[in-house]
Amino acid sequence: AELNTIGEKIFKNEAGGIKKDLVYWNKGENFPSLGIGHFIWYKQGEPGIFEESFPQLVEFLKSKNVKLPKIMAENKYSPWKDRQELINLKTKKNPDIEELTNFLYDNKDLQIMFIFKRLEASLEKMMAVSSNKENVRKQFYRVASSPNGLYPLIDYVNFKGEGTNPKERYKEQGWGLLQVLENMKGAETGKATLTEFSNSAKFVLQRRVNNSDPSKNERKWLQGWFNRCNTYAE
């Protein structure tokens, strides 16, 4: 039950809780974002520094023997050439897009299971690359064992990734879950833990924006990102 509650929160964070925004393409990005976790899906040959997660979701759903909608079943890569094409198809209520949207809306529980599995796998990946393994493990379990502590971990790993991909760096500094945990120092559990996690996430995201190429104007996202981090301490 806790996972389903978390799933609804992530749906709200990523897609504003709006069904049609389960199939989305952000302005200025070279990929669409799909599902409750706004999973990234690249076109064939599209270079991307952000971790792609939609193909893994498709594989996970296949392993559960779920009947996939046409777009997911027939395309290894994102089938739309650009944002405008996807917007046009959505506006025309294209049946394949409608089918995809309905599927993603009706199968929120499977998507949250997928995100949870990603979280479980992430600790090993983070410890493999961290220079301070013990602190990472300690902080991970410190957050996980706090009341409502699974939500921040699951949401953040879905929101900004594990932080283990060397390509996901600006000026050699990452912004994933690993960097948030590495930046934490405390030992007490409970509310204080979640407040520290929330503040650490904001610190890492502020640093990302400071290190980013100003022409990308990432600053425009920051307030929304901070609002999301505030939900971790609630």
Residue ranges and their predicted role:
Residues 1-234:
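Cell-wall polysaccharide-cleaving catalytic domain and substrate-binding groove, primarily
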